[in-house]
Amino acid sequence: MHEIFYTGCGKVGNTLATHLDRKGHEVLLYDINEEVVKKINEGIHPYVEGIRFKNVKATTDLNQINEFKNLICALPVQVIPKVITKVNLKGKNFISASKGIIHENLKRISQLVKEIEPKLKFFVLSGPSFAEEVSKGLPTAIVLAYEDKEEAMKLQDALDSENFNVYLNDDITGVELGGALKNVIAIAVGLSDGMGYGYNARSAIITRGLHEMANVGEKFGARRETFFGLSGAGDLILTSTSDLSRNRTFGKLLGQGYSVEEALKKINQTVEGVKTAEALYEIIKRENIFAPICEGVYRIIKGEDPKKVYPHFLSNHLREEFQR
């Protein structure tokens, strides 16, 4: 039995809490929303009807983190810098379940956290895992990226179950970037579907988008093969093809003629791909990376006409297929 502190009582936070609860671990969730905290303490899952908690509690007191070794962070990426500086991370296992790039400074979560507390042990939990399906105990496979294999094996044992398979990977950068960048490509796929461009176009954007993700990853020392695993191709396929995906839905609404503001209002939840696209645009320009899909999503988010930008998504500039 492990004791795990969890920041973020959104869908992802409650989903993993549900899974950990089934495995008999004690979980304490942190959130600022008192109504959500109250529901959890009454044993009620705040987002999935019919699911009850046994060993999960919640608090609005962030200082209670000091009692726990294992910290899972499932906060929206842009919120993390404000929260993480308020806690003592010394001696912690920090497991990031958030997917994105910090817009203000273009940093990955691992970079931010390690700057605050260099000696903590950092992990990334990522892969194709829609919250509702995990909460219901449906079969899922994800990856845990690590810098300390001994601790990673302990966490793998704590998380793994018959219907929740956890693989290990020592490429933290690749797993982090895969989880973040696939949201941008999913917006592009949704846009294409919203404009009615068919399955050929969808398949092309997913495939070429994966190539762009791997190109960005390699620039930062990630292994290319990581992007063809669960945190890359696996998560990209799921997020790009299911209407449960907020990023795909956002893109689809843009393709149907909604403005950025209208689409975000209609979804009424965090769409991580929007801020990630803005951060990613700065990165691909700075590093001179050929990434027309990622660049196109940024241009559309900034107000350009999707019908004029879309043709550039698959513009090959007469390149070889696997040219970097």
UniProtKB/Swiss-Prot annotation:
Q: Which positions carry the signal peptide feature in this UniProt record? A: none
Q: Where does NADPH bind?
A: 99, 131, 246, 272
Query: What is the main EC category here?
Result: oxidoreductase
Q: SUPFAM superfamilies given for it?
A: 6-phosphogluconate dehydrogenase C-terminal domain-like, NAD(P)-binding Rossmann-fold domains
Q: Describe which pathway this protein belongs to, using the record's wording.
A: Membrane lipid metabolism; glycerophospholipid metabolism
Primary location group: cytoplasm
Tell me the InterPro entries matching this sequence. Answer: 6-PGluconate_DH-like_C_sf, 6PGD_dom2, G3P_DH_NAD-dep, G3P_DH_NAD-dep_C, G3P_DH_NAD-dep_N, NAD(P)-bd_dom_sf
The Gene Ontology biological process annotation of the record reads: carbohydrate metabolic process; glycerol-3-phosphate biosynthetic process; glycerol-3-phosphate catabolic process; glycerol-3-phosphate metabolic process; glycerophospholipid metabolic process; phospholipid biosynthetic process
For this UniProt record, the keywords arranged alphabetically read as follows: Cytoplasm, Lipid biosynthesis, Lipid metabolism, NAD, NADP, Nucleotide-binding, Oxidoreductase, Phospholipid biosynthesis, Phospholipid metabolism
Q: Which amino acids does the record list as binding sn-glycerol 3-phosphate?
A: 99, 127, 129, 182, 235, 245-247
Which cellular components does GO assign to this protein? cytosol
PROSITE patterns to which the protein is assigned, alphabetical: NAD_G3PDH
Tell me if Electron transport is a UniProt keyword of this record.
Answer: no
Q: Which residues form the active site?
A: 182
Q: Where can this protein be found? A: Cytoplasm
Q: Which reaction does it catalyse?
A: sn-glycerol 3-phosphate + NAD(+) = dihydroxyacetone phosphate + NADH + H(+); sn-glycerol 3-phosphate + NADP(+) = dihydroxyacetone phosphate + NADPH + H(+)
Q: What is its EC number?
A: 1.1.1.94
Gene Ontology molecular function: glycerol-3-phosphate dehydrogenase [NAD(P)+] activity; NAD binding
According to its UniProt record, which protein family does this protein belong to? Belongs to the NAD-dependent glycerol-3-phosphate dehydrogenase family.
Functional summary from the UniProt entry: Catalyzes the reduction of the glycolytic intermediate dihydroxyacetone phosphate (DHAP) to sn-glycerol 3-phosphate (G3P), the key precursor for phospholipid synthesis.
Q: What is this protein called?
A: Glycerol-3-phosphate dehydrogenase [NAD(P)+]
Natural source organism: Aquifex aeolicus (strain VF5)
Q: Which gene encodes it?
A: gpsA
